[in-house]
Amino acid sequence: MTPEEVVERYSQVISRASHVTYVPIVPSRAENALVWDIEGRAYIDFLADAAVQNVGHNNPRVVEAVKKTADRLLHFTFIYGFPVEPLLLAEKLREIAPLEGAKVAFGLSGSDANDGAIKFARAYTGRRSIIGYLRSYYGSTYGAMSVTGLDFEVRSKVGQLSDVHFIPFPNCYRCPFGKEPGKCRMECVSFLKEKFEGEVHAEGTAALIAEAIQGDAGMVVPPENYFKKLKRILDEHGILLVVDEVQSGLGRTGKWFAIEHFGVEPEIITLAKPLGGGLPISAIVGRGEIMDSLPPLGHAFTMSGNPVASAAALAVIEEIEEKELLKRAQILGERAKRRLEKMKKKHELIGDVRGLGLMLGVDLVKDRETKERAYDEAKKVVWRAYELGLIVAFLQGNVLRIEPPLTIEEEVLDEGLDKLEEAIEDVEEGRVPDEVIEKVQGW
């Protein structure tokens, strides 16, 4: 089969609700930061498979753990039994989590983890209201979709949970209050206070769910003191802080959890994506009394705690520890960010470079003064990068997502950045035709 044939056959049998197209890559095999398609062409993966492959594609430790476990026990549901693998994983997650006395609930995706976090928060507090963030993305299951702050079509078609409210996330490059960095009064914090004085009853609010760094909103990093100020308000009213670490967790930002950069202790953390190293597994990690607030089977799935996926996840954490990947993410992140800042000085298309560790965003603009989003140009950059052998995507229509594996070799990182700059230059110089715009869907 050719890549074109595969793409066409996808359109015949795969629901469009399950897929979004950037480029027609048809993977055949992968190793660390490299992916080969079915025609043998190699690509550098600057997405880490949508932030899944923190320890690299087909990490040998993870593959070995999967093989050894699968040889003796593919599955035994821990709803009725006590397989050892999810126990060992839960104990390890409790050890690394930045909260005291944690207990764990397992699932299959970041979406169901965030759904579960909402259930636990409501059960523990006896309250109904949930606060989410505009432009946030928490998943596609019903509860996660309901607290997602993206203005996307699905909610208008299927409805959403009641008692969900939204506030703006602090974005110092595109401030929702029209302020400039260093010249504001933290209106992003006072907005929550005003919300409680108006349409939202604070004492009826169970939780606020936040990404420590907004990922699909365009890699938005809040001011350093934002979460401390926010947490004080939440604590005053007995409102839980739920932190979605699905994309930012497990070393991506240079710490186990991105919230650790901001000096607060949440009540609940959700994990998925990189946790299984490529296998489907999620985890809700929360204070013990919160995690015991639902009755038996209140958040249970037949396949959750799967022994093979749990063994893979434990191997991921061990790899991060033994290879010192937290430190490596910091070092490589600084290296990549320096290079991207140099690109910004040369290329007017780049309006902003931001992020922590290897969770980086490059905001493409038509005009640096107006900050008008460069939607078509972003599509062209992604397509041209693909032609050059680099896998990259955009968020919010114009922010390039730079999230390679934490294990990427320095020379491969540099080569990928070279390809990215070449793609940007080709777009600026008009060497990428307009017809590619229709080929790239994105979101």
From Swiss-Prot:
E.C. no: 5.1.1.-, 5.1.1.2
InterPro entries per record: Aminotrans_3, Class-III_PLP-dep_AT, LeuMetRace, PyrdxlP-dep_Trfase, PyrdxlP-dep_Trfase_major, PyrdxlP-dep_Trfase_small
Molecular functions (GO terms): identical protein binding; isomerase activity; pyridoxal phosphate binding; transaminase activity
pH dependence remark: Optimum pH is 5.0 for leucine racemase activity.
Chain positions found as N6-(pyridoxal phosphate)lysine: K273
Temperature dependence: Optimum temperature is 70 degrees Celsius for D-leucine to L-leucine reaction. Optimum temperature is 75 degrees Celsius for L-leucine to D-leucine reaction.
Disulphide bridges, residue numbers: none
Cofactor: pyridoxal 5'-phosphate
Top-level enzyme category: isomerase
Gene3D superfamilies: Aspartate Aminotransferase, domain 1, Type I PLP-dependent aspartate aminotransferase-like (Major domain)
Activation and inhibition: Activity is completely abolished in the presence of hydroxylamine, a known specific pyridoxal-phosphate inhibitor.
Catalytic activity: L-leucine = D-leucine; L-methionine = D-methionine
Deletion consequences: The disruption mutant displays growth in medium with L-leucine but cannot grow with D-leucine.
Binding site for pyridoxal 5'-phosphate: G110, S111, Q247, T302
Alphabetized UniProt keyword annotations: Isomerase, Pyridoxal phosphate
PANTHER family assigned to the protein according to its UniProt record, in alphabetical order: AMINOTRANSFERASE CLASS III (PTHR11986), LEUCINE_METHIONINE RACEMASE (PTHR11986:SF58)
Functional note: Amino acid racemase that shows relatively high activity toward leucine, which is the preferred substrate, and methionine. Also exhibits lower levels of activity toward phenylalanine and alanine, and trace activities toward isoleucine and valine.
Subunit text: Homotetramer.
UniProt similarity note: Belongs to the class-III pyridoxal-phosphate-dependent aminotransferase family.
Record's protein name: Leucine/methionine racemase
Organism of derivation: Thermococcus kodakarensis (strain ATCC BAA-918 / JCM 12380 / KOD1)
Taxonomic lineage: Archaea, Methanobacteriati, Methanobacteriota, Thermococci, Thermococcales
